[in-house]
Structures are given as structure tokens and as C-alpha cells.
């Protein structure tokens, strides 16, 4: 139980991690001629997530009751939101990557897993832009590139779109000495 405001404040190390202090690194896959400007993608990324993970449960029936044991691990997809600039640089690159998996017209695509996947990263930063923790998404590829909503309603908003990636697993690197790190 929290005693006083000062005790609470002393437990909130670094003033708390801030949701707007992050950096993403989207790398090009070896094949598919994606041509993504990775620096531009890092700047124009407006939203990302630190990943989630789940251990499935296995129900084992025994005399009218179930005992639950840990099952397989599963990982959620990873979604990133980008601002769309007027040359569509990031959008075009994501469409090329997605198209290299299954061509819009021919239905053909890259079949060698190592040719169409790349490692991607999201890092939590502190308020001085120092790394607190980095998640590396291993062997990622884009599952979907979202639609961009257009409207004649007079809004002056900059277009955004989401890219959802599937990956095999993630690895963490904690900069803080006490933080556990390693593959998950």
C-alpha cells in the first residue's frame, strides 16, 4: 500500500516511462527491391507499441475438474503508424514489400523466408533520448498496409496509415543494469 505522495514519487524511477519517447527502426529485407529510406521512416513514425505476448493454457480434465498447465507461447502482431508525405515514400516502400510477397497481378512472390524478412526494432527512450529498452522483432514481414481515409470535410490533418507486421519472436536488450534481457 502506498503511504505518502513522496513515497510514491520515490518509487516512480525517472519520473516514469513516457509513451511519446520512442524510436523505431524499420530495415529493408534483402530482396524485393523495397527501397525504404530507414531514416525517413524513423522520423515519420507517429505511433508504435511495445510488444505483448501470451502463454496459451492447456486444460487437463481430471475427475470433473480441470487442471491448467502452461502451453505454447504466441506473439501478437506489431503495428506501426506513419505520417504520409506528398511523395508517398514510406507508403510506396511498404506496398513494394507487401507486393513482393504476393504480386497484385501475377500472384507470384518471394518464397525464400530470408529474402522477404527483416529485423525491426522499437526502443523506449528516457526524456534525454537515452535507450531504456529495445525490442528486436526477428524475421518480420508486413501482413497489411492499411487504407488511408480521404475526406472532403475540410480537415487539415496529415494522412496516416498503419503497417502490421508478423514476426517469429522478439529479443530484448535492457540498458538498465537490473533489467533482464534475452530472447523471448
Predicted regions and their residues:
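Glycine-rich, low-complexity intrinsically disordered segments
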Residues: 1-184
Amino acid at each position: 500500500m502506498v503511504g505518502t505522495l513522496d513515497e510514491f514519487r520515490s518509487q516512480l524511477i525517472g519520473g516514469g516511462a513516457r509513451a511519446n519517447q520512442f524510436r523505431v527502426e524499420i530495415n529493408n529485407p534483402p530482396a524485393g527491391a523495397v527501397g525504404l529510406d530507414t531514416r525517413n521512416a524513423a522520423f515519420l513514425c507517429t505511433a508504435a507499441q511495445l510488444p505483448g505476448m501470451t502463454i496459451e493454457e492447456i486444460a487437463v480434465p481430471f475427475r470433473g475438474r480441470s487442471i491448467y498447465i502452461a502451453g505454447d507461447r504466441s506473439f501478437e502482431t506489431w503495428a506501426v503508424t506513419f505520417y504520409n508525405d506528398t511523395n508517398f515514400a514510406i507508403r510506396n516502400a511498404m506496398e513494394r514489400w507487401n507486393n513482393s510477397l504476393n504480386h497484385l497481378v501475377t500472384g507470384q512472390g518471394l518464397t525464400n523466408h530470408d529474402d522477404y524478412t527483416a529485423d525491426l526494432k522499437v526502443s523506449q527512450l528516457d526524456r534525454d533520448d537515452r535507450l531504456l529498452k529495445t525490442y528486436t522483432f526477428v524475421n518480420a514481414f508486413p501482413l497489411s498496409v492499411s487504407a488511408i481515409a480521404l475526406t472532403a470535410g475540410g480537415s487539415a490533418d496529415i494522412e496516416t496509415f498503419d503497417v502490421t507486421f508478423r514476426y517469429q519472436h522478439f529479443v530484448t536488450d535492457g540498458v538498465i543494469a537490473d533489467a533482464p534481457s534475452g530472447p523471448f
